Amino acid sequence: VYHGPGARSWEEVPRPELREATDAIVRVDAVTICGTDLHILKGDVPTVEPGRILGHEAVGTVETVGAAVSGVRPGDRVLVSCISACGRCRYCRTGVYGQCLGGGGWILGHRVDGTQAEYVRVPFADTSTHLLPPEVTDETALMLADILPTSYEVGVLNGQVSPGDTVVVVGAGPIGLAAIMTAQLFSPGHIVAVDLADSRLQAAKQFGADTVVSTQDSPESVVAELTGGLGADVVIEAVGVPETFELCARLVRPGGRLANIGVHGKPVTLHLEDLWIRNITITTGLVDTCSTPTLLAMLAKGQLDAGRFLTHRFGMDEMEAAYDVFARPQETGALKVALLREAAVSDGGAR
């Protein structure tokens, strides 16, 4: 439960109940923590009110459904998407679910109580959950709730990664690593990962980056050398601070694309005095999760190794410990953590 910037607690709350005919109540069997949750705790998302249960990623079992729900039934095992969609408004009809006008969008853990609980009320259950095939585990399915569709849609697709491209990913946290993983679906010529932490750079190498470079080692010079002075075709910002966005703008070539994924809590200077003449396309976006069915099919066929993101497991009642580990990745090596209803963890959560 969020209690204002810097304040959180794991506490007893009433079990959620159906409010609308389109709702489902889902027993949470596996849940994770997102970098956005850390942004909320910093106060970067002022629309989140104190008292809100956080979390927007979960896998669980349907307990009850409203009278209008026809796509899932009690007992079904489902992925709870980070984006809720009414399915009827102008945006939903064009697949832009993140901008839903009918009461959806990013609401879980934001405007309504979220998934970091034993049970969660899922609005618009027919369009906001996905049935899971038996060959996909709870832990791997968790990666489809947010980080994989976010990196794929907002980073790779918005950046229009194409065969032969030089792609730079600034920020090698879970979202950046997911961008590295999904960028490879389009056969880029070279992937460069930029980060401050050596542990994250090593992880980027394991996830498929061809070159890794510290932010302290002149990424501009490295990219210039790799591209014959042109700059990168695509630069993906996966941090969310002014300095990294401005670095991305310096790394992209004239005519290139800068795709911002990072959640920004402070104003960023857009240097149009330099950019106006360079024909650069800059995209931003909230994930729509329109790619989730495609990614789920790939995961079921073994074409995406989503389990690589999971570094720590906890029991559901170890939420405070999980947050502490996830918030200190340079010390703990955490990428993604999973909190499991049936977990029997006695080693501090490490896999």
Regions found by a protein language model. Give the residues of each.
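Rossmann-fold dehydrogenase core element
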Residues: 257-259, 269-309
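Conserved acidic E/D residue at the C-terminus of a beta-strand in Rossmann-like folds
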Residues: 195, 262, 286
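Glycine-rich beta-strand-centered segment in the early N-terminal region that forms part
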Residues: 14-31, 44-93, 133-135
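NAD(P)H dinucleotide-binding glycine-rich loop of Rossmann-like/cofactor-binding domains
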Residues: 88-170, 307
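Mid-domain Rossmann-like dinucleotide-binding core that forms the NAD(H)/NADP(H) cofactor-binding site
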Residues: 134-217, 221
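Glycine-rich cofactor phosphate-binding loops and adjacent beta1-alpha1 units
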Residues: 158-162, 186, 202-281, 346-347
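C-terminal hydrophobic helical "lid"/dimerization subdomain
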Residues: 246-250, 289-351
